[in-house]
Amino acid sequence: MLSREDFYMIKQMRHEGAYIVDIATQIGCSERTVRRYLKYPEPPARKTRHKMVKLKPFMDYIDMRLAENVWNSEVIFAEIKAMGYTGGRSMLRYYIQPKRKMRPSKRTVRFETQPGYQLQHDWGEVEVEVAGQRCKVNFAVNTLGFSRSFHVFAAPKHDAEHTYESLVRAFRYFGGCVKTVLVDNQKAAVLKNNNGKVVFNSGFLLLADHYNFLPRACRPRRARTKGKVERMVKYLKENFFVRYRRFDSFTHVNQQLEQWIADVADKRELRQFKETPEQRSRWSRNICSVTGYRLRYQLLRYPPCVLGQLYRGWW
């Protein structure tokens, strides 16, 4: 088989008027080959031929390992080499490659929860103008798993107290609490997560105990478990914070957010359900009712003379 350079030389010499016999002499091939190549619009692809003679005795073993979901060719190569295989790696890869389409998918299967069962929590960050100054705004997104309704709380810091305040505000906004709250492995909620053995932050456990929800943490390096809320973080960045870039204060940011959610976000159609979050929220009315919860850093805003009154009642 001739090379690509030979192919283009044949085309060029013929275009310049050279005889086929002269082209064949120059290239070093037969006149018949020259005529065949002149008919091709492009250089013919070189076919790689792999002889599987050396690999054939080990094919049953390789197929067994693939069925066990072992797809690393280096691992299989080492194993069959120890069994007496004398061929190379390329032959093994050539055999495995067409079978890779049989490999089980790594895609996460979306888990749909029942109404009032789960809330997913996550944080995002954008840079906007607040009170005439460019600054970073941290925003907590709390999304109901069933209806996809969400609440957003903007804060100057992404810390434990603002994490808890975002959940308190979300429960108050939704009119109740859910059975489980799914969080990322942020220090505000999770101190340690070792293969499912989770140590939660004591402050987060106090909040969970007060609202009677079960805290849950994502598996490490698998944040896509809470894909619903991560999509809402992206949705906010690409919609609300593109439309609104200037605010008078953080209070103004949160007012604008709640208004935008009511006017826009809750009225968007969810393609997989052909309903809006507002329509699906009618099924979430069975979420548990809540009482107020006062955060430690909020108490510091008041003088000692009124703290006693605040401790006697929840807002």
Swiss-Prot record:
Biological processes, Gene Ontology terms: DNA integration; DNA recombination; transposition
Gene Ontology MF, one: DNA binding
InterPro entries: HTH_IS21_transposase_type, Integrase_cat-core, RNaseH-like_sf, RNaseH_sf
Domain HTH IS21-type: 5-66
Keywords: DNA recombination, DNA-binding, Transposable element, Transposition
Domain (Integrase catalytic): residue spans on this chain: 111-285
Matches recorded under PROSITE patterns: HTH_IS21, INTEGRASE
Homology family: Belongs to the transposase IS21/IS408/IS1162 family.
Task performed by this protein: Involved in the transposition of the insertion sequence.
Protein name: Transposase for insertion sequence element IS640
Organism: Shigella sonnei
Classification of source organism: Bacteria, Pseudomonadati, Pseudomonadota, Gammaproteobacteria, Enterobacterales
